[in-house]
């Protein structure tokens, strides 16, 4: 009887261990984004003043995205209520720009929305105004 109990326990432990172990391999994830945004400011580095935000927007293959609607919003991350938004104007070759008055230094969060023919992309970019 003891032998039967021992064997039953061994079988039970084996079943539990094989149920807990996963033989499935995780699905491959791709890190390629459908849109790449290169962000720069004029002047550079960003200073308290009228600041031009320049966005170079390309697809996953590095080709410029032209004719898109590019909405931008900026929020001061250290001060609630300090934000602005607007539509960037196309400059050609995938470049878009908007000018805003940054009267306060500190940390800012730029949210960029790119929309064009089935493409609806959002990216957040942190930057500092000196």
Please name every model-derived segment.
Residues 49-61:
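Beta-strand-rich structural segments
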Residues 90-97:
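Aromatic sugar-binding surface patches on proteins
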Residues 47, 62-67:
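A short beta-turn/strand-edge loop motif at beta-sheet boundaries
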Residues 71-87:
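Short amphipathic beta-strand segments in non-cytosolic proteins
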Residues 15-19:
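C-terminal motif of bacterial Sec signal peptides marking the signal peptidase cleavage site
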Residues 90, 102-104:
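Residue-level recognition of secondary-structure-to-loop junctions
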Residues 122-128:
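Edge beta-strands of extracellular beta-sandwich domains
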Residues 21-24:
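Bacterial signal peptide processing site
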